[in-house]
Swiss-Prot record:
This is Proline--tRNA ligase. The gene is proS. Its main location: cytoplasm. Its EC number is 6.1.1.15. The keyword Oxidoreductase does not apply. Keywords: Aminoacyl-tRNA synthetase, ATP-binding, Cytoplasm, Ligase, Nucleotide-binding, Protein biosynthesis.
Amino acid sequence: MKFSKMFIPTTKETPNDATLPSHQYLVRGGFIAQTGAGIYDFMPLGKIVLEKIRAIVKEEMDEAGANEVQFGFVTPLTLWQESGRATTMGAEMLRFKDRKNGEFVLSPTNEEAVVNMVKNRITSYKDLPLHLYQINTKFRDEARPRFGLMRGREFLMKDGYSFHSSEEDLVREFNLMETTYKKIYTKLGLDFRVVAADSGAIGGSGSKEFHVIADSGEDTLVVCDSCDYGANIEAAIRKPKTYSFERKSDSKKIHTPNTKTIEEVANFLNISKEQTIKAVIKKAIYEEKTQIVIFFVRGSDELEETKACNAVNALELIDASEDDIKEAGLVAGYCGLFNLPSNINFIIDLELKDEIGLACGANEEDYHLVNTDLSTLKDVKYYDLIAVQEGDICACCGGKLSYTKGIEAGHIFQLGTKYSSAMNANFLDENGKAKPFIMGCYGIGVSRLVAAVIEQNHDDKGCIWTKATAPFMVDIIVSNSKKEEEAKVGEELYSKLKQAGISTILDDRINARFGFKMSDFELLGFPYAVVIGKKLEDGLVEIVDRKTLEKIDVKVDEVISKILELVK
């Protein structure tokens, strides 16, 4: 392709709302253009990158034995009502009515659609397993779309769904998809990490996320420095911390005026934060009600809200207001485990089970209890509630845990029978008994990967595409296209590189200065440039490595062999 024939509207102007490098460079480089909040068009270079990523995803999915299909972007609301997600998906699911008043949805995901496709068409265990996938547009009406392609409302996604007759076969496919995804991200040239994850609104039991490692990542990952353990902080675990506090006397109430924070309590009582219990009061949001819930964790720990939300099966947790707390009969700053109002739901962190000698609120203004004994509590619920901290010990190997940032670019789930049961999608087993399909779900954010590549690979000048994702491998830059000899050599090298199977763009723009062409090369991020300029008089051209910006002089007749060597 020739630059003069291609629509590549580069600009020096950075969008006002673009804070991430990928957003800035993809817009400035003419890869994408915003048409609305969280909605982007892909221009020629962006479309090439998108299709390259799509092709790699498709190749590996097909190799794994999955069947490609295509679901309608628009689905009837009745499917979502059948599964029960018409209400639980919330405002992110965009609904509309047609001229006949029929209710429809712009699909944010396709569990319902795939169950509807397979239901009554696969009826026997003999026809299982089955894996269907698509690479198609999705729409989620994000409240705050931002970061360009990273968190848009409309996006391209690969979503796959598998159907099984046994849990064992689901696990086999789940593991196969983990291997397949690793192949995809490796082919794309990305540094990534597979981590344990929370299943979120999709549901199911086991799930893993695939994160592209980048400082700008929205997700905090907990990783071990000694083994392969990794988890999203929402699902991370640590080796339990143990303490041996003495219970010097029976529990007693101590006057602790104006000591509402953990630090104030610890200082007043002359104990460590580890010897205190923190009460976090939340309002749990359910489909048809709200409820005050208290989560108790050690004073030195922090509550992990996703874990807490899962512990009470809520749609969402929000901070309880002062009025909420008073109305529930609680005392802010002095809330404790003992003598709570009987109607209050509370959950205790697992690491506090049967602990003794700790201090907590006395549920009375200006008073705390000391020397408590949690083993005396009856019929209480314990749950892993804490957010793992850097320096905690790995539960797998005893190594140190640390944080890193990641961009979620893939997620795989063991769904079980959640959707098949809800939608009455069954098969006949070996004994002729009807059973719901056991399902898996596997997603990759294809358009998000376009941005993720750049978040991991850029400098202060622009994009640095990996070899697998670059729109063109080589940019031939003719320093002065008005000079006949330079233009001629440019055309010859362009033709030879194409014949050698190297994707190449020829910057033949007559009215663009050399400095402008080089700036575009650095912004657009093609892996290599071949610069034809003054050195041509000596039979030489320059090859520039975009990643390092190193330049080497190469004889004109050796350019092809050198490029072939570099792109291996």
